[in-house]
Amino acid sequence: MNKKLKLFSMPGAQTSQIVIMLFQSLLHLLEAIASREPTRYIITYSIGNTHTPEIFSYSDLLQSARKAAGALRFKYHVVPGSVVLLHFNDHWNSMLWFWATLIADCIPAMSTPFSNNPETRLRHLKHLSTTLRSPKCLTTASLAAEFAGQEYITPICVQSLDYENLVHLPIKEGGDIAVLMFTSGSSGHCKVVPLTHEQILASLSGKAWTFPLPDNTAQLNWVGMNHVASLVEVHLFSIYTHSDQVHIPTVEVLSHVTLFLDLIHRHRVSRTFAPNFFLAKLRAALSADDTLAKYTGSLSNLRYIVSGGEANVTQTINDLAQMLKKCGAVSNVIVPAFGMTETCAGAIYNTSFPQYDVEHGLPFASVGSCMPGIQVRIVQLNGNGNSVPPGTVGNLEICGPVVLKGYFNDPAATKSTFTNDNWFKTGDLAFVDDNGMLVLAGREKDSIIVNGANYSPHDIESAIDEANIPGLISGFTCCFSTFPPSADTEEVIIVYLPNYTPADTVRRSETAAAIRKVAMMSVGVRATVLPLDRTMLEKSTLGKLARGKIKAAYERGDYKSYQEANEQMMALHHKVSHHQPRSGLEQSLLGVFTRTIPENLTEDFDVLTSIFDLGITSIELLKLKRGIEDLIGHGQIPLITLMTNPTIRTLSDALKQHAQQRDCSIYNPVVVLQSQGKKPPIWLVHPVGGEVMIFMNLAKFIIDRPVYGLRARGFNDGEDPFHTFEEIVSTYHASIKEKQPSGPYAIAGYSYGAKVAFDIAKALEHNGDEVRFLGLLDLPPSLNGTQMRAVAWKEMLLHICRMVGVIREEGIKKIYPRLEPENISPRHAIETVMGEADVTRLAELGLTASALERWANLTHALQRCIVDHKTNGSVAGADAFYCDPMASMAISNEQWACDYIGKWSDHTRSPPRFHHIAGTHYTILDAENIFSFQKTFLRALNDRGI
């Protein structure tokens, strides 16, 4: 293996030299460590499971990545040197496909979570498409819906790549860039940071110089792999130091703060990362009765908690350091640090905290001195580039092997952030004291840092203006951050000019709630909202609000009278409009809410108060989600459910609606797949399997209208399946009219459901209703039950198993011949299928042999209903969606399109519209095809004007 030696010296201090062995690339690093003894491991936990992790050796990672790389090259046909966007929300997929992309000789780009604001999300995706030069994109089926409503980037779900049986792709030298990371930009667009192999390896060697680690210990990470602290500071550094690494989802640690300490003890963790806001929460947790005593002596392996991303309050962190010392950690366990995406995470560390900072009376901790590989200088604020003496605040600039050389495909950003002599301008204000310790003193430009994340106040202001909130005057909104005395983290303030009278408490409350909701949906920050008079919000001659002056006035207390008046008016509003719980569920939810929201905010909270009205943070929102899931006890609640039902009453109604769908005592065909949106709903009719789960992937992409599925009768105990086709149509027609009394209507049916949807449309039109959209998915009008019977029983039974994931595709192929005989009994078929099914998956679904047999019987009953049915009559119009014919049809694509699907023209009073779609009959809505299908489907829906 090729290696090289490099000498580093510690800049700005007495020179000490150390010889560090570097690999030529990250791939060579992984290859070497994977073959090294003793074996080290990657330990990953999942959401809801903090006790039984999945464990992979570094050799497992390498071998799986080589197979996955083969899928990228030979199935996805990536071009060497191109960018592959990786959009995941779990650690293992992020790591696996990061390495697979490198092995495939491509450039991985670590996608950050998308904004909940649709406009912001679309702008971001368009920007990525342009900047990354139309990248390929990998994601999971559960995240595919986040790409809805745009055509800039088309994702592929990794579940469809099926790489396990592929041969290994050999490792070879690739390009200089190892990974692309994203960071915020002043314009609101992210900047793309290319980290090279040489740059990352220099960073890893510098960290190794700074952090000698004990043998047989691990490193712990709880942030996403899209963050440089996770990817470089923990994942790659653990490989470099031949250490175990432990990864756990963020929500688990934030929901149960002391789990952080449990994991440190359980896995002998010696090094981890935590920003200031989390350390403040940890201090509060350890201050509770008996909590500290529980961990006495349990943290003896812990050497370093690196803390960066936001300022560390010396008093707060010192208190925590003393507590951790009682638990067995070293006295200087907390290491305040400075780092950026552009420096491969931490590069300047204070290993003398807290002693140095306490002795020198620093209110915020110093970030210390440089590791090998980076140098700093402080230059005058006037921009002339001259250095300033120790103790003088100036602009912080950096250079060295660990610092990027320029942004990806962004020469303007590169030019603006580098000096003429190639020093990188960080945008931070700082000074170096007489001992060479770096102390940060704020930001050169407007910036908000909350919970370790960096936000542009301009983005928040723009989102509020774009929301057209009735209670404020556009253009007079100002957002800034402040560090209140004795606080542990920054607070976001939003001031605005109201257009209501001061006595209008209803408008005041509604406006504040709307502003907080927009801020949360856009960037996930907590906000204090304050209305001011126009005299307090004067604009410059260029029409701009002076954010700096407004912030200074707020911090001086110039707005104190406005704050007091606002608090009084809001308290009055809550007093006269307080609403009590009206059900046991609302009472239970109220308990969860009040335990999650800070105590000083719970007094005025009621069942009609928006959580955004209380300024709930994104972290508290995740904790609230977990608390409600624990309360209801049946699976996860999508985060968007909480965000779109932000009061106890609306959330209670939403939960009850879902619970009713699980109530087997009353048959109701209507299943709410998506409840939001103001456009007319879309009704989706099941295929011959009778279940609407198949539409779940599609429903994720439809956000502007409710999505209702129609589920067959017969799944639950005591339910008789339908007996006739006419009974199906009349039942569904009545349910549609009850839920949506008037049109225009939008209906679509898949396969068998296409015939049902067609007759429902006829029934609606017969009663004078308008059916503006009728979608017919991959079924010709001429195909009847007799023709379907030969394939439907075995095909649909296997499709059920495939759809719910109890049998993989290779298993389907294996047992298919055993289901060939025409006289095979249902019981024998069920036994054959159950013998091949994944036992664990069956248990997860609660799918027993009897339940599967009931499902098969329902399918058979639905078949009987259509045996003698023939399509007749006509509707105003229709959209027919079709893929290539099944092999069992033994016809050409052209015959299928013209002689079968094309026959719908005989049953429409205007020419039908035909749409060819990807996939096979049973996979058009699967993960690998849903993204392309939903674009075609939603375009057709919109083209019909509904």
Curated annotation (Swiss-Prot):
It comes from the Eukaryota. Residues 580-659 form the Carrier domain. AtrA has a A-T-TE domain architecture. The adenylation (A) domain recognizes and activates the aryl acid substrates, and loads them onto the thiolation (T) domain. The thioesterase (TE) domain shares the missing condensation (C) domain function, and is responsible for condensation and final product release. Nonribosomal peptide synthetase that mediates the biosynthesis of phenguignardic acid. PngA alone is sufficient for phenguignardic acid synthesis. PngA first activates phenylpyruvic acid (PPA) through its A domain to AMP-PPA. The PPA unit is then loaded to the T domain and eventually transferred to the TE domain. Another PPA unit is then loaded onto the T domain. The TE domain likely promotes the enolate formation on the attached unit, followed by a nucleophilic attack on the carbonyl to yield an ether linkage between the two units. One of its GO terms (molecular function) is very long-chain fatty acid-CoA ligase activity. Its EC number is 6.3.2.-. Keywords: Ligase, Phosphopantetheine, Phosphoprotein. Belongs to the NRP synthetase family. GO terms for biological process: fatty acid biosynthetic process. The keyword Methyltransferase does not apply. Gene3D superfamilies: 3.30.300.30, ACP-like (1.10.1200.10), alpha/beta hydrolase (3.40.50.1820), N-terminal domain of ligase-like (3.40.50.12780). Residues 681-933 are annotated as: Thioesterase (TE) domain. Pfam families: AMP-binding, PP-binding, Thioesterase. The modification O-(pantetheine 4'-phosphoryl)serine is found at residue 618. Residues 32-450 are annotated as: Adenylation (A) domain. It catalyses: 2 3-phenylpyruvate + H(+) = phenguignardate + H2O. It comes from Aspergillus terreus (strain NIH 2624 / FGSC A1156). This is Nonribosomal peptide synthetase pngA. It is an enzyme of class 6 (ligase).
